[in-house]
Amino acid sequence: PSGPDGMLPARYLSESLDRLGISLRRFKTGTPARVLRSSVDLNRLERQCGEEYITPYSYYTDATELNSRTQSECRIVYTNEKTHEIIRNNLGRSPIYSGRIHGTGPRYCPSIEDKVVRFADKSRHQLFLEPMGRDTEEMYLQGFSSSMPEEVQRAMLASLEGFEKAEMMRTAYA
């Protein structure tokens, strides 16, 4: 076991809190896979640019300096019937659907499995490919959180347009 983003786990924390009489609940994090930017064909994805002028949140932030920076672009990609078929064919392998994981998931960010099952009438679901930072090749595929096994996640990822050769840096987890 590990913590988020490769951090060390907080071993025995739950047991310690339980001994103190604090009731615990499990919340599912709904974290998507991370992919290597250079392995994705960005030219096949829709560009999602930021605002032309960025208004700072704080009076202490210099708006001129902030707006002189080059913004990092996001991209939009959509799931497709092949993606949905892979998910439907592997629902029994999902800890969330097999009952191995119990917990409350994020209200507005369902896993991709949940989207495919709950919104079966939709032929596609919008995903956002977001840079994790300026100095990293790591990209975050927002809207694609999953509890599927790694090999299923890899197949799901490869089914997306522009992701046929995508390298997964970190798997998604529930």
Regions found by a protein language model. Give the residues of each.
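Residues forming the flavin
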Residues: P1-A174
